Amino acid sequence: MSGWDEGAVYYSDQPQFPEAGDAATISPHAVLTKFKEFIRNFEIEQNCFPYREALLDNPKRLVVHLEDLLSFDSDLPSLIRSAPADYLPVFEKAAGEVLTGLKMREANEGGVMEEPLTRDVQILLTSREDPVSMRLLGAQYISKLVKISGISIAASRVKAKATYVFLVCKNCKKTREVPCRPGLGGAIVPRSCDNIPQPGEEPCPLDPWMVVPDRSQYVDQQTLKLQENPEDVPTGELPRNMLLSVDRHLVQTIVPGTRLTVMGIYSIFQASSSSNSHKGAVAIRQPYIRVVGLEDTNEASSRGPANFTPDEEEEFKKFADSQDVYKNICTKIAPSIFGHEDVKRAAACLLFGGSRKSLPDGVKLRGDINVLLLGDPSTAKSQFLKFVEKTAPIAVYTSGKGSSAAGLTASVIRDSSTREFYLEGGAMVLADGGVVCIDEFDKMRPEDRVAIHEAMEQQTISIAKAGITTVLNSRTSVLAAANPPSGRYDDLKTAQDNIDLQTTILSRFDLIFIVKDIRKYSQDKEIASHIIRVHASANKFSDENTDSKEDNWLKRYIQYCRARCHPRLSKDAAENLQRKYVTIRMDMKRRAHETGEAAPIPITVRQLEAIVRLSESLAKMRLSHEATPDDVDKAFKLFDTSTMDAARSGINQQINITGEMANEIKQAETQIKRRMGIGARLSERRLIEDLARMGMNDSMVRRALLIMHQRGEVEYQRERRSIVRKA
């Protein structure tokens, strides 16, 4: 037996780390040492150690730039990129040991003796490299470090994720700790107990381990859903989603609607299935990203990205200093559309926007401009919406008939696997910092239209559903297009009949355009010539790359102006605006007194703020930090040709009513009251047809209904299709 005990024992260090090229010869201890040296000794300039100082300022987390790691040691970034799940814990251990050493040095210098503590530090990675498209992530990226970008559309509640599970054997009471896989992975509990039974003792059965939750170790964990940026989605395809897992200090830092750049480990997990019928799919795994670094790129909060080249900035400043900047920008707005110069000016103001302000008492005033295009079909309203969606840095396009209140604001979704509720942002949330284009605005149900009242003025969306109470940001401009109730704008009807929208929603629009299809020989000839020329020259003389470069230049210039310029009104401009606003109010009061009816579009303090925003957007176009009286004059002119024209429309029709017309209207009122009892409901079309058989004039019947509606005697329902007698 002694022969078995003789001889030397040889051993080798064989770590369970994957090979990473030339770095395969590096031992775990050497990697740990290199990470510690990097945190201690990396310096930007003489005696400036950023990571050492950052660790002392915030001992819970340390943000590391991979470019700094590469300049310090070329092997470390390749190790982290190839096997981040193995080397990140080593990095965090190194950070904890460095922090402990720094704290002990501080304590010794201060003459205070402290017991050294093992500190947990979360390492967060960031890089200046370009993100990978979500559509290109495949099997070759599994367990590798990737960088993607998108919009967070949903966030779950915070859960407790076990890092170590404490187990107790039910038979012999032996204990052990089992580590859990990070992310969405679980713990691998052994099937048998490794305790050797004494003679006469009964051996431990199969699956004897029992989890003790109170003695296990936990961290906070949250799951997010990331969606592709709208501008990255190919035409005609649905946006892709990716599940994200964040833990520890990244929890509850992101709300739906935030634009993110994510650095993480592309991982897989087995999704739980409610049925056991999919036995053949045992090898199928669902991808997700375990986040190891988050960067908020939302332009509304970070004031836009600073990734403008010096050449671009010089070009933008040169353009801003040129003559007629306002005119040059308006010529770049929808050049394929003939005419509609005022609408193009409004679209330019909407794209640049005003300045968002925060008052000392915490109240925030919106800087985004809302525009409504109301008018006849075939007047290029939808074309304007499409152009703005393509040109705005952030934009979401939707149609009124296919949009619900939840789809526009936010919805509460129940997770099919965990059965818990989580928030999913709608169009107004996803377009935070950009533009929402809503076509067929008049086709929306009134209750859905009411849902965006708060989003249009306060620029927040309050949610109180299924136990979730929160406020989401929706700092967006709204560009809406609508048709009158009868399909076309009828000059024989009053403005109240043509603009069938509530006063509450109309007052939230800064500019309201009534776009009419005017039949004029010379104008029709020019429009026809322009459209034929556009169709004939499409893809013939113009290069698509040239058009895309022009659009991209305008988008970049808008982005630059919104990020770098936040103008305010000058003193002279403020006095000029005050005089003009008082004049408008007195003019509307005089007209209402003459006609005896209220204006269809109210002129309130919101319209005063609208002119302020328009003036600021005009100053922003030329990168000026001060809006001048000339800007106020241009803004007032645009406001006068849009909202004021709409408010004045139809009023003069009520002035010159002859005695004969008054008698006919009175007779029509009498017949309507005789035909409908109090509380009765009747179709407007049927009522007009019935009275027409009695010899009543259609226009007089409509005028009588309008007067009774203003007095509160009848009420329109179901989009003005039916009438209910109230009194």
UniProtKB/Swiss-Prot annotation:
Tissues where this protein is expressed: Expressed in shoot apex and flower buds.
InterPro entries, A to Z: MCM, MCM5, MCM5_C, MCM_CS, MCM_dom, MCM_lid, MCM_N, MCM_OB
Ligand binding (ATP): G375, D376, P377, S378, T379, A380, K381, S382
GO molecular function: ATP binding; ATP hydrolysis activity; DNA replication origin binding; helicase activity
Motif (Arginine finger) on chain: 507-510
GO biological process: one example: DNA replication initiation
Record key words, sorted: ATP-binding, Cell cycle, Cytoplasm, DNA replication, DNA-binding, Helicase, Hydrolase, Nucleotide-binding, Nucleus
Compartments reported by the entry: Nucleus; Cytoplasm
Domain MCM, first and last residues per copy: 325-531
Chief site of localization: nucleus
This enzyme's EC code(s): 3.6.4.12
Keyword DNA-binding: yes
Entry GO terms, CC: cytoplasm; MCM complex; nucleus; THO complex
Catalytic reactions of this protein: ATP + H2O = ADP + phosphate + H(+)
CDD domains linked to this entry: MCM5
Role description: Probable component of the MCM2-7 complex (MCM complex) that may function as a DNA helicase and which is essential to undergo a single round of replication initiation and elongation per cell cycle in eukaryotic cells.
Subunit structure: Component of the minichromosome maintenance (MCM) complex, a heterotetramer composed of MCM2, MCM3, MCM4, MCM5, MCM6 and MCM7. Interacts with EGT1.
PANTHER family tied to this protein: DNA REPLICATION LICENSING FACTOR MCM FAMILY MEMBER, DNA REPLICATION LICENSING FACTOR MCM5
UniProt record similarity statement: Belongs to the MCM family.
Name assigned to this protein: DNA replication licensing factor MCM5
Origin species: Arabidopsis thaliana (Mouse-ear cress)
